[in-house]
Amino acid sequence: MPRAPALLFSCLLGLCALVPRLPGLNICTSGSATSCEECLLIHPKCAWCFKEDFGSLRSVTSRCDLKANLIRNGCGVEFESPASSTQVLRSLPLSSKGSSPAGSDVIQLTPQEVTVTLRPGDRTAFQLQVRQVEDYPVDLYYLMDLSLSMKDDLENIRSLGTKLAEEMRKLTSNFRLGFGSFVDKNISPFSYTAPRYQTNPCIGYKLFPNCVPSFGFRHLLPLTDRVDSFNEEVRKQRVSRNRDAPEGGFDAVLQAAVCKEKIGWRKDALHLLVFTTDDVPHIALDGKLGGLVQPHDGQCHLNEANEYTASNQMDYPSLALLGEKLAENNINLIFAVTKNHYMLYKNFTALIPGTTVEILHGDSKNILQLIINAYNSIRSKVELSVWDQPEDLNLFFTATCQDGVSYPGQRKCEGLKIGDTASFEVSVEARSCPSKHVQHTFTLRPVGFRDSLEVGVTYNCRCGCSAGLEPDSARCSSNGTYVCGLCECNPGYLGTRCECQEGESQSGYQNLCREAEGKPLCSGRGQCSCNQCSCFESEFGKIYGSFCECDNFSCARNKGVLCSGHGECHCGECKCHAGYIGDNCNCSTDISTCQARDGHICSDRGHCVCGQCQCTEPGAFGETCEKCPTCPDACSTKRDCVECLLLHSGSSADNQTCQNLCKDEVITRVDTIVKDDQEAVLCFYKTAKDCVMMFTYSELPSGKSNLTVLREPECGTAPSAMTILLAVVGSILLTGFALLVIWKLLVTIHDRREFAKFQSERSRARYEMASNPLYRKPISTHTVDFTFNKFNKSYNGTVD
C-alpha cells in the first residue's frame, strides 16, 4: 500500500520523460525556440543544431529537436545537448570510533564536498552516508528552572553530577558537564517588583518565606570533566519566586546555545542541552505585557559575571529563532518536563529540529534515567537538514536505513545502533536558469552533527557554440551577428540572412507568411515584411513564432495566475516546472505533504494526488487520512503477526507464513510491558487458554512497525471445585436474603403509607354537641302562682 503512491509518481515521471518522443507531441519543435538558449530551456531532451547549412533556411525552429532527430536529419555532431552532472570534490572515509583526544579526525558524514552542474529540468543525483560513531565525545549542559515550585527538585539533584558521569562513561570515554539556571524576567507582571520584594520576593509566603531575588539566566558552571564542581555548584543554589506561572526558560536556552565560548561547547562533540521545568514557557510577544517591544536579536548577552543582561530589554525569543540557533550550533535540546505539560513540549519538538521530550517526575528523581533515555534516542536516529537552499532548486531524498530498504521521500532513519550507517540518495533539479551567471551553494547537515556536505551548484544554461559568435558577419549580409548556426539581425533588418529591411514587402511571396492556405497573414498578429512575419507587440506579453502563432500569455490559469505560477507559457501550452504537472501546472508531484506522522503515505488509507491525500478507505478522513473511527484498529492488524511468530497459535504457524505476516515489523520480546509509554499503543487480547497477551506498537519513520511483545502471556490460576461450590451456595443464600430484605422493606413502606393516610383522615373529622330526645332528667321544675289571702300576702316561687 505505501509503495503505490511512489509507484504512481514514478510512472508519471516516466510518462513526462516520454512526451517529447510521442507523435504529434514533440515539445522541442512546438516550442518555437529562436535561439540555442531558448531551446535548451524547453525540455532536457531537446538539442540545438548549430551546423550552418542545416534544415530549412526559412525555419529557425527546425534546429531545435530531439537529438536523435537532429542526427537523422544530417546535423552530425554539431549540436548542443548538455546534461546535468555530479562531481565529488572531497570524500574522506567514515570513522568507526570517536575516541581520539582532539576528535578532529572523526568523520561521521561522507562525502564532504560535491559540485553539481544542472541543466534546467534535468535531474542529477549523489549519495551520502552518515554514521553514529562509537565513543563520540559528549558535552551536556544542565539548564534548571529555579522557581519556587522546583525546590524539591533542587534537593534531589545535588549528587546528580557523580551519578550522571558514571552512567555516561559507560557510553563515552570523553564526557563533560555544565550547569545554568533561570527564573524569569525581573519586571512586572512576570516578577514581584515592589521595593519590599527586591531582596526577598518570598516575603509573606508562609510555606517558604526566604528566597533569592528573581533573575533571567545565570551561567554557573562551564562545561568541565570535574563532576565534583557540578555537585558543589548545585549545592550553592537557592530557589527564587516569580509572579505568573510561565517561566523565562527560552531566554536561557538561547543564551546557552549562542554563547559558545562562555559555555565551552567543543567543536567535535555531541552537544546536549537538558532543559528541566515544571511549567510552560514564555514565548515571543509575551514580553509586550511588560513593555518589551524589541524582538530578540539572537545574540549572546552574558556579562563578566555570566548573567543575562538583556533580560529586561528584549522580548522572549520565538520558536523559529530557537530552532535556527540550536541548529547553527549543533545542539540537541532535551525537554525534561512534568507530565501535565508533556503534550505542549511534544508539539514544540515538531517545530524545533533535533529536540526530544521526556516526562520528569514531580521531584526529578528520574532525571538520571531520563537523560540516558534521551541520549539513546538521539543517537538512534539520523535526520538530514538543508541550509541555504536556492529557490529555483528542487531536492528529492531517498533514505536507505539499517534494513537495506529504500524509502523515497524520506530523509530520516530511526532505530539505528551505534556504528550503523544510514545512506541517502539526494537528487537535485533546477527549475530555471538564474538571471545572472552565478554559482550557488547549499549545505546538507544531519541534525545535531558537526559534519556537513557542501554542495556547489552551477547552471548549464549557455550554449558552447555562443563562444564563436561573429558580429556583423558576412553570413548575415553584414547586418547581424552569426551565432550557433543562425543570424541575429540588427534592429531594422529581417530574414534568415538579415537581407531585408523592415517595411519591405513582396506581395507575390506573402503566402510564405501564412501558416496554411486561407489563414490570415502572420495569424493576424503581425506584419509580413521581406516574406517574414514581424510580430506586433502586446501589452499582455510576447507574440512570437514563424507565423506569429504563439504567445506567452494565452495559457490556462488557476485562480487568475498563469500556469498557477509553476510553469512557463509556451505557444498556448503550460510547460510546468519540475515537480508540477497538469494543464495549468496546479498539480504537485511532491508526496512529502501526504506523509503522515508515522511515515506512511496517506496513513496507508488513500492515494497522494497533486500533493493532497484522497482517502480510499471507507470512513477515513483528515489531511493525511489519519482519522478513521471505523477502520480496523492496529491492535487487530498486528495480532496475527504476534500470534504466529511468538505464540505459534495462528492457523498457519510455519516460518514462511510468519515471515509474510511480519515483513513490516521489528519485534522485541520483553518480560514486562511499559503500559504508560506515550509513544506506543498498548494492545492486549485473550488467548485460547484464557490467558492475556499484551504488546505495544509504534510506527517508525521507515514505515515499519516496532512491536514490543511479552515473552509469555499472563495466565491466572484456575479456582478449586470447593471454591466454586461455596461461591454458588453463597450467592444463592445472599440472593434469597436480599429478596427478603426487599420484601420487608416494601411491606413496611406500604404500612407506613396506610397509617399516615388514616391519621390524615382522622385529623380532618369534626363533631357537634346534641341531646337524646328520649332522655328525661330525673328532676322536674314547676312554677306555682298563689296568694295568701288571710295575711293579705302573695307568694310566687318554686315548689319541689
Curated annotation (Swiss-Prot):
Q: How does it sit in the membrane?
A: Single-pass type I membrane protein
- Name recorded for this polypeptide: Integrin beta-5
SUPFAM superfamilies documented for this protein = EGF/Laminin, Integrin beta tail domain, Integrin domains, Plexin repeat, vWA-like
Q: Where does Ca(2+) 2 bind?
A: D184, N242, D244, P246, E247
Keywords (alphabetical) are: Calcium, Cell adhesion, Cell membrane, Disulfide bond, EGF-like domain, Glycoprotein, Integrin, Magnesium, Membrane, Metal-binding, Phosphoprotein, Receptor, Repeat, Signal, Transmembrane, Transmembrane helix
* Segments forming domain VWFA: 136-378
Q: List-wise, which residues carry Phosphoserine? A: S771
Q: What range(s) does the PSI domain occupy? A: 27-76
As given in the record, the signal peptide range reads 1-24
One GO molecular-function annotation for this sequence?
integrin binding
Q: What is its main location?
A: membrane
Q: Which residues lie on this side of the membrane: Extracellular?
A: 25-722
The upper taxonomy is: Eukaryota, Metazoa, Chordata, Craniata, Vertebrata
The record's comment on protein family reads: Belongs to the integrin beta chain family.
